[in-house]
Amino acid sequence: MFLFSRKTRTPISTYSDSYRAPTSIKEVYKDPPLCAWEANKFLTPGLTHTMERHVDPEALQKMAKCAVQDYTYRGSISGHPYLPEKYWLSQEEADKCSPNYLGSDWYNTWRMEPYNSSCCNKYTTYLPRLPKEARMETAVRGMPLECPPRPERLNAYEREVMVNMLNSLSRNQQLPRITPRCGCVDPLPGRLPFHGYESACSGRHYCLRGMDYYASGAPCTDRRLRPWCREQPTMCTSLRAPARNAVCCYNSPAVILPISEP
């Protein structure tokens, strides 16, 4: 193991068997060599003076002669790859020989890009596509909505709205009477009695099964119509009173309980 001194840089051994006499290291200063000229390493190579090369005039003439012969030979061959205009086709030849179309269908192409080929296009029309910003809202507006089929009979709310509309119209002109079809006066086989009531506003009798009123004023003729009954049906019970005001109130019977007599 050697320990070096910073001053003398002399290795000092810690072992007695490896001891040697200390010697100092001296650095001798030498003057740079005197040179009249040295190459500038930072000079751009392109700016240096080029040496004149010897050019053989016979070899230069031979190269020019070979170039002329090669150009003449290439121009004499029809359809040579160096003349690509030989392969250019007119529009008529392209229409006849182009493999991009099948038969006479201009839209039946081999292009398999999305929405570019009619053979794999989910849109069956050839009209131009809508702009991207208006495509979604236009598609949503024109999309058919799956609505349930409209029932033949109106529900309680629709019946009440229709009654109020008829009452508002009856103030200006006389409307035909609504023929009631209650279960008590029109007992059809397989049907339970329904609740019919008289409106205090219009003074008419309404049946909750359905209204036999038409815009033309003539009731349906194929139905079995019964005369207007002025009493409340005895076989039905309502848990809530009928509508009090046809204009402001949309009350309808909440629960209808058919009562069977023993």
From Swiss-Prot:
May participate in intramanchette transport and midpiece formation of the sperm tail. May play a potential role in somatic cell proliferation. One of its GO terms (biological process) is protein-containing complex assembly. Microtubule inner protein component of sperm flagellar doublet microtubules. Interacts with alpha-tubulin. This is Sperm microtubule inner protein 6. It comes from Homo sapiens. Keywords: Cell projection, Cilium, Cytoplasm, Cytoskeleton, Differentiation, Flagellum, Mitochondrion, Nucleus, Spermatogenesis. Expressed in testis. Strongly expressed in ciliated epithelial cells with lower levels in goblet cells (at protein level). It is found in: Cytoplasm, Cytoskeleton; Nucleus; Cytoplasm; Mitochondrion. Belongs to the SPMIP6 family. The keyword Transmembrane helix does not apply. It comes from the Eukaryota. The keyword Cytoplasm applies. Induction: Down-regulated by IL13. GO terms for cellular component: axonemal A tubule inner sheath; cytosol; manchette; mitochondrion; nucleoplasm; nucleus; perinuclear region of cytoplasm; sperm midpiece. The gene is SPMIP6. One of its GO terms (molecular function) is alpha-tubulin binding.
